[in-house]
Amino acid sequence: TPAGKAAHFPWLPAASTPLPVIGVPINSTLDGMDALLAIVQMPPGIPVATVGINGALNAAILAVQMLSLGDEQLAGKLKNYKKGLAKKIVDANEKLAQVKYAFKTN
């Protein structure tokens, strides 16, 4: 559930379904901090999983992680996706290590 100016919105589905609800605070006023704080401060009994501001990708990955608990094929796809993410980080670090500067940086 994306939440910008109506950051209290995730409580509606969270209060009326036993299914997990993921709140995504969207950057609006106060750099999204108002939305983030509104989502993480849900009342007792109305849990909402919350990701970072503008964290729709992480919300999607979290949803797939939940769904993959009962689906081996989906779990395999998620594992491969995460391996790809790890490879991108390793590759980026290797490229960054090759950058040389003519002046001292530390």
Q: What are these model-derived regions, one by one?
A:
Residues 2-3, 29-33:
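A general structural motif
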Residues 5, 28, 55:
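Glycine-/small-residue-rich active-site loops that bind phosphorylated ligands and cofactors
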Residues 1-25:
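Glycine-rich phosphate-binding loop
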Residues 31-106:
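C-terminal binding/interaction regions
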